[in-house]
Amino acid sequence: MKKLAPAFVFSALTLAVGVAAAQSQPVIGLITKTESNPFFVKMKEGATAEATKLGAKLLSAAGKTDGDNAGQVTAMENMIAAGAKTILITPSDAKAIIPAIKRAQQQGVQVIALDSPTDPATAVDGLFATDNYRAGVLIGQYAKVAMAGKKPVIATLDLFPGHPVGAQRHNGFLKGFGLTAPDAKSNHLGGAAAGVVCMADSFGDAAKGQTGMENCLQKNPGINLVYTINEPAAAGAFKALKAAGKEKDVVIVSVDGGCAGIKDVGAGVIAATSQQYPLKMAAMGVAAGVEYAKTGKKVSGYTDTGVTLIAGKAVAGVESKDVKTGMDLCWGNK
């Protein structure tokens, strides 16, 4: 790993630095939000495998933290200088990254968003991602049935304000649960829903998820349902609940479907999670980059890469797969 600037981490896989490298084989860049989140680790694995398969050179970079827009901008500039003709990016800041994307496109670079849309979504050439609103709806529907007969006292551990993915999952969960919620196009969290007693930002991080859950329990010790933006946040929430002696009284639902998260479903930490497929997103992005390098044909619009509800215990009226299936599928692992 080689650090080129303090704001981000930049690495090269089979990289010959310089524009000349692009003349012999396609050069494709992958910029993720962080390199510590298992989701983005798996995405990088998928991009690496597809690049090797198709004979492309892959550059990779990641912000230090989720929300590190400056690091992503610098990474993009370095990749263009190194000859990348397609850049795949999971935008940390859906709006702030737009000027850098426009500059790249003006230089003939195809820019494809993975997992997270930009704002507006049309700023990139294409988007390969989960339908995050549907992912939220699925776990909301599951939670509604799982909580039958109980008065819901809900906490949400979200990403951070204004991010499309965070809003779509949160609002989808509310919709699936039967509560008032903004539609899939809104980047604002629905917060006035009956039963939601606490909302906290976790940044998708286990430690911050634990802190957020602790704070929510202080506000309302009677919380019995927790939505989390992802499985690391869910794991943090469970730690807080266990420390308070409440882990058996609370249903946790989440999104991601990574192998570690599916194990947590099997262990009863998470009741159900919506599984997405970063390996598929990355592979499709690399393939599109190779196609552009060879033919000049760009991708366009949104491609749904799929979502599956994985549950520890099936509930009536909500289609789901079991833990074994989730482990077989986790993030496209097999």
What are the residue ranges of the model-derived segments?
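Gram-negative bacterial Sec-dependent N-terminal signal peptides
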Residues: 1-22
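A residue-level marker of the well-folded mature domains of exported/periplasmic proteins
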Residues: 3, 21-334
